[in-house]
Regions:
Chain A
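Short, hydrophobic/aromatic-rich segments at coil-to-beta transitions
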Residues: 71-80, 94-103
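Beta-strand elements of well-folded, non-transmembrane domains
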Residues: 36-38, 84-86, 117, 132-134
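A short, structured loop/turn motif at beta-sheet edges
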Residues: 37-41, 71-72, 94-96, 115-125
Length: 163, 193
């Protein structure tokens, strides 16, 4: 049964399932998920342009600057700075087609975004998670829930208007 | 994104060029990766998922079949949530295997529709067929219960001994032998149709 030609069924973990698994395990994570009324081929490249997209759909990020980017296998590794509430925080980012993980220095903050085509690519399922994965930050969770829900609403509106 | 705790608005702000460089230590692998993930490093948790993905995909796909993707997500939720309970990081693959098999059986049982009763299958001698010649095994696997698929996968794909399979599934070795025999027989019968 182990012949090279044998095709045992193989399961897959899509970007959203991967992000959900992380969200389920990271303490204090808040997440939101929805369907954007925009083709995946339009929505994801727009989101993946972090410098322009994040400050537009995340009202709490005033600016995001990419300092360095380099290919890393099928992904890209980025070094960025995001400014929020007057605080500028460095992040290391892993960016793939449909998946983005942004982790701040010393793990002070975590952002995960994932997307997959639905309806044959005509629309886009989007998953967004943020967390302050540090002890004693549970009270922040309610705020985070509101923040990620607002981000998703903004993104939905932007997608509906063609970005 | 709100500011992290302990940082107030208007606090000290480093210049944009002072972030951590990408160049640094070699990528974490194996035990170090597991340790970093256990410490709550989300990038390490994700890297661990990517490293384990091909193996877990094979186990969940072969046992849970059409629900394999769901089983895979459940496996990684359980793996990441319980990493702190993994006493020996070097044993991560065996530990993940156990979780993947458990989750795949659970998901497959929940979704189970039409499954043949292995007890009703040929109880004769094990088939003298070259099962290595099998190309498309999904339809054959679909006729087995999740528990029988688990035994088959662990023995034939993972190469575990019957004793190891018994230990992993928490059943007697004789039960493994019996399930394996029936699974192989059923597999061959369906393939011969």
């Amino acid at each position: 049964m182990n012949a090279p030609g044998a095709r045992w069924p193989v399961a897959a973990l899509g970007p959203i399932a991967r992000a959900r698994a992380l969200a389920a395990a990271v303490p204090g994570a808040a997440s939101a998920e929805g369907v954007l009324d925009a083709p995946y081929d339009v929505a994801w490249p727009w989101v993946a342009d972090l410098e322009h997209s994040v400050p537009r759909f995340d009202a709490q990020v005033r600016a995001l600057r990419v300092l360095e980017r380099r290919p890393h296998g099928d992904a890209e590794e980025l070094r960025i700075r995001a400014t929020s509430f007057g605080v500028s925080l460095p992040f290391t980012v892993r960016l793939e087609n449909g998946f983005c993980l942004m982790q701040a220095r010393r793990r002070l903050y975590l952002v995960v975004m994932a997307a997959e085509p639905v309806e044959e690519g005509a629309r886009t399922r989007f998953f967004h998670m943020e967390a302050v994965p540090l002890p004693g930050t549970r009270p922040l969770r309610r705020h985070l829930r509101r923040a990620v829900a607002a981000d998703l609403r903004n993104l939905t509106r932007l997608a509906s208007s063609g970005f | 994104m709100p500011p992290p705790p302990g940082r107030s608005a208007g606090g000290p702000r480093a210049g944009p060029e002072s972030g951590e460089p990408l160049a640094g230590p070699a990528p974490l692998v194996g035990v170090e990766l597991v340790r970093a993930a256990r410490r709550g490093d989300a990038a390490a948790m994700d890297a661990l998922v990517r490293e384990l993905m091909p193996y877990v995909g094979r186990v969940c796909g072969a046992i849970a079949l059409d629900r394999g993707d769901d089983a895979m997500q459940e496996t990684f939720v359980a793996v990441l949530r319980n990493l702190h309970g993994l006493r020996e990081p070097a044993a991560v693959h065996g530990w993940v295997r156990r979780i993947a098999v458990r989750e795949a059986i659970r998901v497959a049982r929940a979704a189970r529709t039409e499954v043949l009763d292995p007890g009703a299958l040929d109880r004769g001698a094990a088939p003298a067929v070259d099962l290595d010649a099998v190309v498309d095994v999904r339809s054959a696997l679909a006729g087995l219960s999740p528990e029988h698929r688990a035994v088959l996968v662990l023995r034939e794909v993972d190469g575990l001994s019957e004793a190891e399979v018994a230990g992993l599934l928490g059943v007697a070795e004789g039960t493994v032998k019996s399930r394996l025999h029936r699974a192989r027989a059923a597999f061959a019968r369906r393939w011969a149709r």
